[in-house]
Amino acid sequence: MRDLVRSGKVFLYGEFIGLLREDHRGFHFSYNPDYQGIPLSLSFPIEQSPFHSDTLFPYFASLVPEGWLKHKYALHQRIDESDMFRFLLNNGENMLGAVQIQEEKQ
C-alpha cells in the first residue's frame, strides 16, 4: 500500500473546476463545489460526489503525449514512461486545448 498522495488542480478555460488526486485507493476526480459551468466531459457530469477509478481516468490519460514525444518527455524530465499521472502533473500547464492541470504541492 502506498502512502503517496499526488494531486493536480484542473482548470477549464482558465477557471478552476476541480481536483484530480491519486492515493493508495486509486484515482479520484471531484468538482470544485463553486463550479457551475459546463462538464469537463460526458464521462464527468457535474455532481458533488467524487468519481473513482483504479487506473487513471481515460479522459485524463488521453491528454498524455504518445509515441516518440512521450519518450522524449520521459528522457528530458527523467520520469517513468508508464507514470501517466506524472506526465500530467509535469506538463499540464502547457497542454493544447482548454484543459490545464497544475500540480498541487503537498
UniProtKB/Swiss-Prot annotation:
**What InterPro entries is this protein classified in?**
HipA_N1 (IPR017508)
Q: Which domain of life is it from?
A: Bacteria
Q: Which cysteines does the record link by disulfide bonds? A: none
Its recorded name reads Uncharacterized protein HI_0666
Q: What is the lineage of its organism?
A: Bacteria, Pseudomonadati, Pseudomonadota, Gammaproteobacteria, Pasteurellales
